[in-house]
């Protein structure tokens, strides 16, 4: 399966990198590398994440360190919708693509 990243995820990743990079740019790079690696696992094992009915009936999440990768399984693609810190008010975030 192919991985498709939403525009919102790109913004989430930029925000995440900038937040960590204030203290250590190399650590920010490594953190994002781990997020990309974990997201790549979805191509091989799309069902690995747990269902998130409080977000949407077809949305799942996969834990990566302190963040959650929210995604939806389509016929031939995995749509990554958001990457959010686990302490956020998750049900009240926007998960839909524009």
Where are these regions (language model features)?
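Basic, Lys/Arg-enriched alpha-helical interface segments
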Residues: 2-59
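Basic/aromatic recognition patch in beta-strand/loop cores that engages polyanionic ligands
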Residues: 47-77
């Amino acid at each position: 399966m192919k991985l498709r990243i939403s525009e919102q995820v790109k913004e989430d990743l930029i925000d995440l990198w900038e937040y960590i990079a204030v203290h250590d740019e190399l650590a920010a790079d490594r953190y994002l590398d781990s997020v990309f690696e974990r997201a790549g696992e979805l191509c091989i094992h799309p069902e690995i994440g747990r269902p998130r009915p409080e977000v949407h009936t077809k949305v799942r999440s996969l834990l990566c360190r302190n963040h959650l990768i929210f995604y939806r399984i389509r016929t031939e693609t995995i749509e990554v919708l958001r990457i959010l810190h686990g302490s956020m008010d998750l049900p009240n975030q926007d998960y839909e693509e524009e």
